[in-house]
């Protein structure tokens, strides 16, 4: 049995492969070693992934995820090894490499990721050969859900948009200004929270 994972900061899509055939797809929360500790990743794997896996041992895991830099990938590999019944290799790569391989195959090209965060690279057909650090939603991640949500919330709370839009926004997401401040500055995963606010209902602004 082989596991392949594609993970952003908000969600992870898992595919279980048996004898070369995908047999099950599983969804869990995002696993990002840049924002989460080894223990937090283990907890998510144990509680959300393990109960949904078919019985048996896992021969290999191929994990492509946000935050899986060479420095942080070992954190993820250890968490997986300590949480799942694995007898083979655990490979952890960046989600950017997954996007490049999926988009370009064996050809050279530019690939981009746009989700809770954002990233881009130049790919030579085998590996990523040039990449500018996205820097996260505070310093970078331009165009991402977290940054769009941050800009929208900032304009709303500073009364840069009409009272009608502000009222519609707070009603749609069932939030107050103090609750937003608390979620951004005091609660974990403000990037996920801000990204969840970016899709303001079009009916609210027309």
Residue ranges and their predicted role:
Residues 52-91, 103-104, 187:
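Short beta-strand-loop/turn "lid" adjacent to the catalytic site in phosphate-handling enzymes
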Residues 203-206:
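Conserved small/polar residues in nucleotide/adenosyl-binding loops
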Residues 128-174:
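Glycine-rich phosphate-binding loop plus the immediately following alpha-helix
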Residues 87-111, 122-131:
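Active-site neighborhood for divalent-cation/phosphate handling
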Residues 38-53:
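Short, well-ordered amphipathic alpha-helical segments that serve as non-catalytic structural scaffolds
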Residues 1-20, 109-124:
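Gly/Thr-rich phosphate-binding beta-strand-loop-beta motif of the actin/hexokinase/Hsp70
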Residues 160-200:
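Conserved ATP-utilizing enzyme core subdomain
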Residues 11-15, 23-24, 34-37:
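Short N-terminal binding/cap micro-motifs at the start of the first secondary-structure element
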């Amino acid at each position: 049995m082989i596991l392949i994972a594609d993970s952003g900061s908000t969600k992870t899509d898992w595919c279980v492969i048996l004898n070369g055939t995908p047999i099950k797809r599983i969804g869990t929360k995002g696993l990002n070693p840049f924002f989460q500790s080894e223990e937090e990743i283990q907890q998510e794997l144990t509680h959300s992934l393990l109960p949904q896996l078919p019985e048996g041992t896992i021969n290999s895991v191929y994990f492509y995820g946000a935050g899986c830099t060479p420095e942080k990938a070992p954190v993820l590999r250890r968490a997986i090894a300590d949480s799942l019944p694995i007898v083979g290799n655990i490979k952890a790569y960046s989600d950017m490499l997954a996007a490049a391989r999926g988009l370009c195959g064996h050809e050279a090209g530019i690939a981009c990721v746009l989700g809770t965060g954002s990233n881009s690279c130049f790919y030579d057909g085998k590996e990523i050969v040039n990449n500018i650090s996205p820097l996260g939603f505070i310093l970078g991640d331009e165009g991402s859900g977290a940054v769009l949500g941050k800009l929208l919330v900032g304009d709303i709370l500073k009364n840069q948009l009409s009272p009608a839009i502000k009222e519609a926004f707070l009603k749609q997401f069932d939030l107050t200004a103090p609750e937003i401040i608390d979620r951004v500055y005091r609660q974990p995963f403000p990037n996920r929270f801000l990204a969840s606010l970016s899709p303001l209902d079009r009916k609210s602004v027309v």
